[in-house]
From Swiss-Prot:
The protein's role, per its UniProt record: Part of a membrane-bound complex that couples electron transfer with translocation of ions across the membrane.
NCBIfam families: PRK01908.1, rnfG
EC main group: translocase
Protein name: Ion-translocating oxidoreductase complex subunit G
Keywords: Cell inner membrane, Cell membrane, Electron transport, Flavoprotein, FMN, Membrane, Phosphoprotein, Translocase, Transmembrane, Transmembrane helix, Transport
Subcellular location: Cell inner membrane
GO terms classed as biological process: electron transport chain
Any one GO cellular component localisation term in the record: plasma membrane
Its EC number(s): 7.-.-.-
Annotated gene: rnfG
Membrane topology note: Single-pass membrane protein
Subunit architecture: The complex is composed of six subunits: RnfA, RnfB, RnfC, RnfD, RnfE and RnfG.
Transmembrane segments: 9-29
One Pfam family linked to the record: FMN_bind
Length: 211
């Protein structure tokens, strides 16, 4: 009886070790592939907010981390520096809209040296399908309305939904979500306008990791 119990215990131990080893091996073999896929997805988004014609450097490897309350969080946010012939041409910066209807909304905005928005995309959100999710380009083209716009002292108050006297469309039954994104993009652009030199002087220290 005791011998049988020992044999069963040994069998279970061997099985557990084999299973653990197989999981570890699978993770090891797929880790590089996952990282490669993440880099491809990141590059695809970056090329949507900074045209490929505006840079000749590897954007995912030209990344620094910046911190400012205007980015909607006190966590350091990845910021990608586009250069051409060694000269900076644009910045793509991630930021947070902390006041979305269902929580935080993460966006990325490309901004040229004159403070003009080259493109904005939503990276992640939890907004209600059919209502707040219209901020997502896969659902509607609303997010494209930021392209070409600038943030100045004169037009600051126009960075609102039309219902509040601004220039941006709201969604039927979902005003909180666009308000949050508009405010986040405005504050992000304002931060870059005020801190461009400081951003460009930062060391490249996040190596394209989306932290």
């Amino acid at each position: 009886m005791l011998t049988a119990i020992r044999k069963n215990g040994l069998t279970l131990a061997i099985f557990a070790c084999a299973t653990t080893g197989l999981v570890a091996l699978t993770q090891y073999l797929t880790e590089d592939q996952i990282k490669l896929q993440e880099q491809k997805q990141l590059l695809s988004v970056l090329n949507q907010v900074i045209p490929e014609t505006m840079h000749d450097n590897a954007l995912t490897q030209s990344c620094t981390l910046v911190t400012s309350p205007e980015l909607g969080t006190m966590h350091a946010m990845p910021t990608y520096i586009a250069t051409k012939n060694g000269e900076p041409t644009a910045i793509a910066i991630e930021s947070i809209a902390p006041d979305g209807y269902n929580g935080e909304i993460k966006v990325i905005t490309g901004i040229d040296n004159q403070g003009k928005i080259l493109g904005t995309r939503v990276l992640s959100h939890q907004e209600t399908p059919g209502l707040g999710d219209k901020i997502d380009l896969r659902v509607t083209s609303w997010i494209l309305g930021f392209t070409g716009k600038q943030v100045t002292e004169d037009n600051w108050n126009s960075w609102k939904v039309r219902k509040d006297g601004g220039d941006f469309d709201q969604f039927t039954g979902a005003t909180i979500t666009p308000r949050a994104v508009i405010k986040a993009v405005r504050n992000t652009v304002n931060y870059v306008n005020q801190s461009r030199d400081e951003i460009l002087s930062q060391p490249l220290n996040c190596a394209g990791d989306n932290q």
